[in-house]
From Swiss-Prot:
Biased composition (Basic and acidic residues): 9-21
InterPro entries: 1Cnucl_rcpt, 1Cnucl_rcpt_B, NHR-like_dom_sf, Nucl_hrmn_rcpt_lig-bd, Nuclear_hormone_rcpt_NR1, Nuclear_hrmn_rcpt, Znf_hrmn_rcpt, Znf_NHR/GATA
Domain NR LBD as annotated: residue spans: 211-439
A GO CC annotation given for this chain: nucleus
SUBUNIT field: Heterodimer with the retinoid X receptor. Interacts (via domain NR LBD) with CRY1 and CRY2 in a ligand-dependent manner.
Record-level Gene Ontology MF annotations: DNA-binding transcription repressor activity, RNA polymerase II-specific; linoleic acid binding; lipid binding; nuclear receptor activity; RNA polymerase II cis-regulatory region sequence-specific DNA binding; zinc ion binding
Location relative to the cell: Nucleus
Name this polypeptide is given: Peroxisome proliferator-activated receptor delta
Pfam family, one: zf-C4
Record's keyword annotation contains Ribosomal protein: no
Annotated spans, Disordered: 1-58
Post-translational modification: 'Lys-48'-linked polyubiquitinated; leading to proteasomal degradation. Deubiquitinated and stabilized by OTUD3.
Composition-biased stretches (Low complexity): 36-55
Amino acid sequence: MEQPPGEAAEVREEEEKKEVAEAEGAPELNGGPERSLPSSSYTDLSRSSSPPSLLDQLQMGGDGASCGSLNMECRVCGDKASGFHYGVHACEGCKGFFRRTIRMKLEYEKCERICKIQKKNRNKCQYCRFQKCVALGMSHNAIRFGRMPEAEKRKLVAGLTANEGTQHNPQVADLKAFSKHIYNAYLKNFNMTKKKARGILTGKASHTAPFVIHDIETLWQAEKGLVWKQLVNGLPPYKEISVHVFYRCQCTTVETVRELTEFAKSIPSFSNLFLNDQVTLLKYGVHEAIFAMLASIVNKDGLLVANGTGFVTREFLRSLRKPFSDIIEPKFEFAVKFNALELDDSDLALFIAAIILCGDRPGLINVPQVEAIQDTILRALEFHLQANHPYAQYLFPKLLQKMADLRQLVTEHAQMMQRIKKTETETSLHPLLQEIYKDMY
């Protein structure tokens, strides 16, 4: 959704001031001591007051600024161009988008419309964005021979030849250490790992079998303490079962956002980013990460809830009235395909980190800094997959494609949430989720 004209103008003016400050080498703004987001207080969504925002979760003062002092516009989206990239004047976002698409051989779902690509919506249709890049003359050959700084040329060439002589690369030890750090952060911050979930689902874990929720009666039994006792108490009973299930989903989502925030803060260099960029990365990345991790607790028949003590059947969720019955089914379809890749928790840790540190999110300030962190994560992921899945030759490019699939899944989910907000007048969204969905795509 578009911002009100006055608000948008104020935001742009503030960003321009900060852009100048950064261009002049202004130091990164600092804030107070770090503090984690409190657990979700979820008594009545419609009465929540001053809830913790993404900014509160990060607990760092100040704000960021967009870089770049060029007046030249990006030929692709109209944002400020940062230079002459791959044959045309382009911004950092479109440069990175084109580079990743070519380098990672991504294929986007074909769009029959000719979407207008602008700064505010450039991530909405990746197919039309790439077609515009090509139509404007952005060149594949420019990746190696285009007009760009020598340092960047060397970096790209190194990336393109990453598969050659990996075992003799002096950075291998660093990549291993980096991967281990990310994995440890994952284990520390996420309560439900894939290993734990699959053990419960297959009955191999030394864990009481989950209580199966397959109809209204079993749901209310669960509400009386069989399953939900460890969740926040005080969720008011709603007469309509579909709305009640919807609110339970929000409870889980808000808690997972908290876990993801703590995980992100453990990723090397994340906390060195501008605060504005940290918030932006979380805003756009948390749902992609959530839906990727959701696959761990899903099988074709249903999903685990309440830390593995309950199991809600897929058929029961399908039986809810529309639009609530439409929310989860696309996630099941994605999860079944994603699980076929047979990733383990060490793979997922790096994959989730790569999702969060994505350099083409709308509104990012220091795109090169974010991309540099993601490049490190992707190199670590590729190397880790080669070691962990030596016979899965195309696993890395498949995961890169899954990142694009997740973005489309989240776009559709955000649009559905906005429709529910407008049409279901007696249904409220948690304020933190409202903040995330606002102006997303």
